[in-house]
Amino acid sequence: MEEAERFPRLVSLACHDLRTPLATIYGFARTLTRSGDYDERTMRFLGMIEAAAEQMTEQLDDLGVAARIKGGRFDPLIREADTLDLARSEDARVETVGSGERVETDAEAVQGALSALAIAAIRHGPVERVTWTVDGRSLTLAPVTDAAAPVVLGEQIRDLGAVVARLVVEALDGSVALDGGSLRVVL
């Protein structure tokens, strides 16, 4: 195995091996929470453990995707999706407007990438809300402050989701670029 392949394989292996103990932590916290036999404080702590385990699972997923892309083993699941739907987020701080276009892409990976870019813009802005403006294959995220721009672009390695988001978009032949106070993604 060449050196360039070794590190991405190591990261993939670590992600895989960490899932079992993490699933155990999540499973026990969830089981205890469902029993409801605890005081309010303990239930709150169990909920925090559950939420942290879910977040860590998402981060392991991101690391696995990055390792597959960097290792040349990314195998996207291509299907037709509307760009407006891809930009929609469950997070109330992210608004989506405009008109989409049907594209062939890895919808789940792209939707996760767009969500991660929006959350990074909010977190590192810091700003209260952001908006995706969709115009066909072109999606514009605003505002992206000067403080958030290098993080959202993945140039400053301070947000795993943003770094992986850019890798995903570019692996699917898209682009991510700063355009004044906004981020432009072309799918």
Q: Which residues does each PLM region occupy?
A:
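Conserved E/DxxT/N motif and adjacent residues on the DHp alpha2 helix
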Residues: 12, 27, 58-72
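Conserved C-terminal segment of the DHp
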Residues: 24-39
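Glycine-rich/acidic phosphate-handling loop/turn and adjacent ATP-lid/helix
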Residues: 138-162
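Short alpha-helical segment of the dimerization/phosphotransfer core of two-component systems
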Residues: 51-56
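Short flexible loop/turn segments at helix-to-beta-strand junctions
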Residues: 41, 70-81, 102-104
